[in-house]
Every structure is written in structure tokens, then in C-alpha cells.
Amino acid sequence: MIDSHELKRRDSYLNKLIGFQDTEPVKVITGIRRCGKSSLLKLMVQHLKDTGIQPEQIIEMNFESFDFRRMNADDIYRYVKERIVPGKRMYLFFDELQRIEAWEDAINAFRVDFDCDIYVTGSNAYLLSSEYSTYLSGRCVEIKMLPLSFREFLDFHGFEVRETQSALGGLRKQVFDKNSERYELREVFDAYMRFGGMPGIADVGLEQEKALSLLDGIYSTVVVRDILEREKRRGQKQITDPTLLRKIILFLADNIGSSVSIASIGNTLVNEGLLDDGKRKGAPSAHTVQAYVNALLESYFFYEIKRFDIKEKAYPRTLGKYYIVDIGLRNYLLGFRNRDSGHAIENVVYFELLRRGYDVAIGKIGNAEVDFIATTADEKKYIQVTESMMSEDVRKRELAPLQSIRDNYEKIVLSLEPGLDTSYDGIKSENLIDWLLSE
């Protein structure tokens, strides 16, 4: 087991947790398997100890452990009650709590019966379902955790970005590893696009065979434990076909950033002979496919993005898009090759915007489309993503939707053009890698 003092800090998440310390809401950390939730709990425990909280005030339960996985809500309550220190505030940490049936009863009882600060992780959105909210009367705060950003990837893998001076006096960013070996920034970014941001990759190194093994374990756990087994525990009968589930995963992974309808998924799988060795004639019902897609969204394997009509200021009932939580998982599923790199970098930008706290939608402006509208309570940005702006045709295509938007919010085109930092009639054009490193 890795001790907390050996864990890499992820300050953006840890600082959020610390900011909610000793407040009434239950702190709920959500995200796909193996994205770092358990490590974040350990870092929070270490923070408490470093700031004077005594070890006996801290109770940790990991429901992946054999010691706890067979417990029910009553068992959990008794376990905690026996360890309460009279007159002291207790800090309760529950990892992968969604495995326990009726866990909501125990959490609500702790809030009522004890002076405690509660932290929970879960790998399924069921943790924040309507049933859960009812039990806690809305008294919870969600920390949404994602795989590593590009900046975190550099840190976890021991890379450091430095500005170096060329013989002609110009400055450029280069990357150095722990052995002072030098790499071009684009080379390391390509490694990020290849292996993805699952923290465990840093433990096995940037070697394809080891990375594939780790990603296979994550994929299998999500499919088997977080979807198929959970459906059985809930007594649901909608998701019963592992083959159909895997085929839908492959379809969505292959179509990230493309407009997708639920009906088109089933029809494509049948038309291309991908179900029952091509023997199946009829497509699965839209209701069935929707249930499978919902399960993938609930497990944080895929994220759905809706369209927003900029002129009408409304969300029309039109097709959305899906993005995969980690580009390394996509490469594991579809093969390590240069496929559809335009949508792949879109995928990276989408999740970076989520990390930075934006609500993200696709922009519709007439018949044109803006890749992303990113909004917060007091900020809005329109963002286009493309591999290159060198071609005049591409420039016109990417700039036209932004030029047709009649407001004064920031408009940006991100591309992989090196050293790019220019403007087209007030529309900023930035290098994507520099943008990823900018915050």
C-alpha cells in the first residue's frame, strides 16, 4: 500500500476538500475508477493529522477491502459507533461506499447522532441519485474528479517544463526529466495523447505493454463491477448483455465528438454485423440502448454534451455528442494509432474546461457550430479546436462561426501550431499545448 506521504498531491482537488472541512455538507468525491479518489482521501487524512487532528478522531473504511465489503448499513453504523471518541469531533472517510446496500441510512444516522465531518467517494453517479439527495435533504457537496490534466501528467511522470534560449536568442519551452534528459514539449504532449491521464500509468511508466495491462484492468472493473454487477445488486434487468455493452462502448469511443443518436447506435451495430456474429437482424430497442448508455454515463466512462442555440438562447432537442473520460482508454479500446486526432484533441479540451470549472455546451449558430461554449457564473468563452490553422480554408471554416456571434465575450481558436499567438479580428488564436499549461 502506498502511504500518503508518497502520494502525489493534486492541489486543485485537495484545496477544495480543505475548503469544505468542518462544514455541514457531506463531501462526495465522484469520478471513474482509478482516477485518484482514494489517494485524495489519504491526502486529506494526512492534512488533518498535520493540522493537529488526533488519529483516534479519524475513521477510515474502504469498501473494496475484504474487511468491509460484506458489511451492511447496520454493520457500518456499529463499527463507527464503537470508535467514537466522546467530546471530540470525528472525521469519517468512506471509500467506494456505493457497494453497500442502504448505505444512505448509515450516513444520515451519523449526521444526526454524532459530531462528525463526513467524506465519501463513489465510482457511480447513483451515489448522487434522487434517492440519495432525499435522504440527505440536499446537504452534500460534490467534488468531481477526473484523470490527470496535461500539467498533472508532467508532474506525475517527473517532467519539468523550462524555457530555454536558442542560439539566436529566442525563448522556447522544453521538457526535462529527472535525469535531465531533454524532450520537445510536443513529444511529451504526444505521449499524453497516447497513454492518457490515469494516475496509475505513472507507476508502470510510459511503456505500451504495461500501460495496456493497467487500462485493461480499469476497463474490466468499470464494465463488470460498476455496471453489470451493480445492475444485479439493484435488481435491474435492463443491462444483461455484456457483448452489447462492450459494442456500445466501442461505438461511442470511435465516435467521440460526433453527433450521435440513440437509434443510430443500435442500427449501426446491426448493419455492420457487430452483434451475434452478424446473425442478429433487428436492432436493439432505443429504450435498451439508452439504458446501456446511461449506465456508461453513470460510471463516468463517457460524458454527454448538449447543444446550445446561441441566437435562441435555448437547448434544442437535437443530437448531442459524447466524449470519453480518458484518451488512453480510447487508445486501449481502438488501438494505439493516429486515428481521428482532431476529435481526440477536442476530447482533451472538453475535459480541461470541466477541470477549470466551466459548464460546457456545443454552440449552434444558424447552421454552423462552435465546438465549445464554456461558462461560469461570471464568464463566457467560445472555443474552436483544430489541429492546424495553416490552411486558408481551415482558417475560414474555424473563424466563420465565431465571427457570426454578435457579443463581446472572448472567442478563441486552439490549434497545435507551434509558437502560435495571434489574433484575427479580435478572435484569439492560441497554441493548444500552451493553453493547457496556462492555468
Task: Please tell me what each predicted stretch does.
Residues 4-22:
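Pre-Walker A adenine-sensing motif
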Residues 29:
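Hydrophobic anchor at the beta1->P-loop junction of P-loop NTPases
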Residues 37:
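Conserved lysine of the Walker
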Residues 40, 44:
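Hydrophobic positions on the alpha1 helix immediately C-terminal to the Walker A/P-loop
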Residues 59-88:
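Short glycine-rich substrate-engagement loop in P-loop NTPases that contacts/grips substrate
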Residues 117-123, 144:
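Structural recognition of the conserved hydrophobic beta-strand(s) that form the central parallel beta-sheet
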Residues 131-254, 258:
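Interdomain motor-coupling "hinge/lid" segment immediately C-terminal to the ATP-binding subdomain
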Residues 208-379:
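Accessory nucleic acid-recognition modules appended to NTPase machines
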